[in-house]
Curated annotation (Swiss-Prot):
NCBIfam families: murG
The reaction(s) this protein catalyses: di-trans,octa-cis-undecaprenyl diphospho-N-acetyl-alpha-D-muramoyl-L-alanyl-D-glutamyl-meso-2,6-diaminopimeloyl-D-alanyl-D-alanine + UDP-N-acetyl-alpha-D-glucosamine = di-trans,octa-cis-undecaprenyl diphospho-[N-acetyl-alpha-D-glucosaminyl-(1->4)]-N-acetyl-alpha-D-muramoyl-L-alanyl-D-glutamyl-meso-2,6-diaminopimeloyl-D-alanyl-D-alanine + UDP + H(+)
Organism: Polynucleobacter asymbioticus (strain DSM 18221 / CIP 109841 / QLW-P1DMWA-1)
Membrane topology classification: Peripheral membrane protein
InterPro entries cross-referenced by the UniProt entry: GlcNAc_MurG (IPR006009), Glyco_trans_28_C (IPR007235), GlycoTrans_28_N (IPR004276)
This protein's name: UDP-N-acetylglucosamine--N-acetylmuramyl-(pentapeptide) pyrophosphoryl-undecaprenol N-acetylglucosamine transferase
SUPFAM superfamilies: UDP-Glycosyltransferase/glycogen phosphorylase
EC number annotated for this UniProt entry: 2.4.1.227
Family: Belongs to the glycosyltransferase 28 family. MurG subfamily.
GO biological processes: carbohydrate metabolic process; cell division; cell wall organization; lipid glycosylation; peptidoglycan biosynthetic process; regulation of cell shape
Tagged with keyword rRNA-binding: no
Keywords, ordered alphabetically: Cell cycle, Cell division, Cell inner membrane, Cell membrane, Cell shape, Cell wall biogenesis/degradation, Glycosyltransferase, Membrane, Peptidoglycan synthesis, Transferase
Length: 357
């Protein structure tokens, strides 16, 4: 019996790639043949190859922030990408095509329609990206990571690693804790300077007996500067370039201060952990603000725009939050999670392909 096959399309950012990899791995375990369409010069190439999925390269990029030359070349570049996608799909003959977002999905989505291959879309952010908005008109099914993102779409949540869903319930975790609060800071790569500048200064304003313990993920690029800043301010902190086991780090934290990318917000909800979300202000379509408000509107997180970020107010916020407050916030966040998102996306793909998982 021939195995069912899927072509996953995603690229550009981790918010598109990582949920695609979660679905790809799930379907591979279920016995599907999985291939990936992406840009060989994008971050998806390294990530997908490291997971041992066949990679099909298409040359196509976005227009936002590009000059007039890129816009003038769009028809030629799109035609080339469509031709490449056509050859790939004619050869692979996938039972279903899954677009997870990013400009690279646009030519492949068009060709899936021409070749009468079922197209399923998944939008990770609270604000739909350009490619998904355009392709939604021809997709068989549209799925979203957040509610009320696109018309005629099913809110399934964002596919994440199973380890995030396996953590003990927040009420159980928080009730067992005593002593100073545990603070986890995830600086990320986008605009980390604002967090790295203000958070150590805020902690220095908190009296020693009230000061939380701190783990700060800095990234390799900012590690030495951040170590010096904490030391100069006399604040003891565990500063790491990277946290390998993020589910455990979330589970052990009382409060997380971080950006609000789609996957981060979904992981916070899955784990059930209180957070202070500081959206990256220059994200496309300001989607990080909308992502953060998904939790903050339900009193499941503190929403702090970067323009309002300063050490004095941040220190006051941390001091005013009790562990009981944080537990209640974490419980509300957990109630918004979609623990079976990966399975649901896979089920929809199988349904559109007319086969079982």
């Amino acid at each position: 019996m021939t195995k069912p096959s899927i072509l996953v399309m995603a690229g550009g950012t981790g918010g598109h790639i990582f949920p695609g990899l979660a679905v790809a791995e799930y379907l591979r375990i279920c016995g599907w043949n999985v291939s990936w369409l992406g840009n060989q010069s994008g971050m998806e190439y390294r990530l997908v190859k490291s997971c041992n999925f066949p990679f099909e390269a298409v040359e196509f990029g976005g227009l936002r922030g590009k000059g007039i030359k890129a816009k003038l070349m769009l028809p030629i570049n799109l035609a080339r990408a469509c031709h490449q996608s056509w050859k790939i799909m004619r050869r692979l003959k996938p039972n279903v095509v899954l677009g997870m977002g990013g400009y690279i999905t646009f030519p492949g989505g068009l060709i899936s329609k021409l070749l009468k291959r079922p197209l399923v879309l998944h939008e990770a952010n609270s604000v739909a990206g350009s490619a998904n908005r355009a392709l939604a008109k021809i997709a068989m099914r549209t799925l979203t990571g957040f509610p009320n993102t696109m018309e005629n779409a099913e809110w399934v949540g964002n596919p994440i690693r199973q380890e995030f869903d396996d953590i003990a319930a927040p009420a159980e975790r928080y009730e067992q804790r005593q002593g100073p609060l545990s603070l986890l800071v995830v600086g990320g790569s986008l605009g980390a300077a604002a967090l790295n500048e203000n958070i150590p200064a805020a902690l220095a304003l908190i009296p020693l007996e009230q000061r939380p313990t701190v783990i700060h993920q800095a990234g390799d690029k900012h590690l030495l500067d951040l170590q010096k800043r904490y030391a100069d301010l006399g604040v003891l902190a565990d500063i790491r370039p990277f946290i390998e086991d993020m589910p455990t780090a979330y589970a052990q934290a009382d409060l997380v201060i971080c950006r609000s990318g789609a996957m981060t917000v979904s992981e916070l909800a899955a784990c059930g952990v209180a957070s202070c979300l500081i959206p990256f202000p220059h994200a496309i379509d300001d989607h990080q603000t909308a992502n953060a408000q998904f939790l903050s509107d339900a009193d499941a997180a503190v929403f702090l725009p970067q323009k309002n970020l300063n050490p004095q107010d941040l220190a006051l916020m941390i001091q005013n939050l009790t562990r009981t407050d944080l537990k209640e916030m974490a419980v509300r966040a957990h109630a918004l999670s979609k623990p079976h998102a990966t399975q649901r996306v896979a089920e929809v793909c199988a349904d559109c392909a007319g086969v079982g998982i």
